[in-house]
Structure formats: C-alpha cells, structure tokens
Swiss-Prot record:
Entry's family note: Belongs to the bacterial ribosomal protein bL12 family.
GO function term, MF aspect, one: mRNA binding
SUPFAM superfamilies documented for this protein: ClpS-like (SSF54736), Ribosomal protein L7/12, oligomerisation (N-terminal) domain (SSF48300)
Name the UniProt record assigns to this protein: Large ribosomal subunit protein bL12
Ribosomal protein recorded as keyword: yes
Keywords: Ribonucleoprotein, Ribosomal protein
PANTHER family linked to this entry: 39S RIBOSOMAL PROTEIN L12, LARGE RIBOSOMAL SUBUNIT PROTEIN BL12M
GO cellular component, one term: cytosolic large ribosomal subunit
Gene designation per UniProt: rplL
Organism the protein comes from: Streptococcus uberis (strain ATCC BAA-854 / 0140J)
Length: 121
C-alpha cells in the first residue's frame, strides 16, 4: 500500500474539529509524543534569555589593528603570543565563555577600543 500524502491532506481538510482532536490524541499515544512540547520549549527559551546572567564574548572580526587586538586578547585571556594570534586569526572565536554581564561589557569595551568587532552571546 503506497502512502499518498495528497489523499491524507485532503482527508484532514474534510475532518471536523472533534475528529482532528481524536487524531492528534491517537498520534500522541501511538508514537509517545505530545503536541505541546515544542511550544513549551520555546516559552522556556524566551524566559531563559530574559534572565541571562552569563555571556560568551565572541571575537567576530579583528579589524585593521590586528596587533592591538592580539595584545588585548593576551591581556584578557592570559594566553601566549602564538595562542592569542591563532585565536584572532581564527575569528569568529570565543574569547571568554560564561562571564558575568559586567565583565563581558568590560572585555567588549577593551577589544573594541583595540579595533575588534565583538558579539556578546
């Protein structure tokens, strides 16, 4: 028996609300899923962003003053010259992860002053 999607869609269009409700319940029971789960996940994600207290500082681009950006990255991260240069050359890259909002803003200001483009995530 071949599955004909057009026929299934046509049947769904003709079904009443009660029949569609029964169909959803049957699918939930048969496959062990719920129709409400994606909506709850989206709502939880939005609430999490509103109360976000830690950020990742991402170097999006080094800009024209690459040497100054490398120096700033070394100062902020404590990395050696080679590692800091590799991080700057590999942009976009995370400079620091899971930092407080105030510290993230300070890091962003230092790096932007050095000529970098920064994104807080």
């Amino acid at each position: 028996m071949a599955l004909n999607i057009e026929n299934i869609i046509a049947e769904i269009k003709e079904a009443s609300i009660l029949e569609l409700n029964d169909l959803v319940k049957a699918i939930e029971e048969e496959f062990g899923v719920t129709a409400a789960a994606p909506v709850a996940a989206v709502a939880a994600g939005g609430a999490e962003e509103a109360t976000k207290d830690s950020f990742d500082v991402e170097l999006t681009a080094a800009g024209d003053k690459k040497v100054g950006v490398i120096k700033a990255v070394r100062e902020i991260t404590g990395l050696g010259l080679k590692e800091a240069k590799g991080l700057v050359d590999g942009a976009p890259a995370n400079i620091k992860e899971g930092v407080a909002a105030a510290e993230a803003e300070e890091i962003k200001a230092k790096l932007e002053e050095a000529g970098a483009t920064i994104t807080l995530k």
